[in-house]
Amino acid sequence: MTEKTLLSRKHDRAFGHLDRNGTGFIEREDIIDLGERVLSAVGEPTSSERGAELLGAFGEVWTVLVTACDRNADDKLDAREYHIGMTWAFVQDEEGYDRIFHPAVKAVMELADTDGDGSLQAGEFRAMQLAFGTPADEIDEAFAGLDRDGSGSLTVDELLRAARQFYTSPDDRDPGNGLFGRI
């Protein structure tokens, strides 16, 4: 058996964020459920403008993935299809990341910034991470690993860079690898 690459292990973690019911598949409802968990964690109604924006962005991510990678046309993705889709749509196609995935990530980060100061404090970061399903005992470590300047906060821009590294970078030196805990 070959060892999984860093990017594959990160995509496994991301697949787990979505497959919370343990079916081994991701469906559109799973992606929308993640959006609803994020909204709930930050106290934002799904019916608000920001809530609708986030859910719409998550819906766009789903559309790109399922269109590109649902090989058997069953409207769900198994782990292999998900890995292929993430790699094709957002790693190999940087414009795809910028056009489709970045807006969804940005919407999450801006919603998590509940006081609107342009950065996430440890508590805001924790709420976002718990919504994603990051193990609670790894959240403080993730925050510290991303807080490279020791300021006690993470700017939305820093988090956007970390997310890009997490979802697209094979470089094991990137701090964004730890965005969702230990890989």
Where do the PLM segments sit?
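Amphipathic regulatory helices of Ca2+-sensor modules
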Residues: I26-T46, D78-Q92, S119-G133, V156-S169
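Hydrophobic, well-structured mid-protein blocks that either form specific transmembrane helices
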Residues: C69-E95, A104, V108
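The feature marks the first
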Residues: T2-E44
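Primarily EF-hand calcium-binding motifs
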Residues: S8-T23, A52-D74, H102-G116, E138-V156, ...
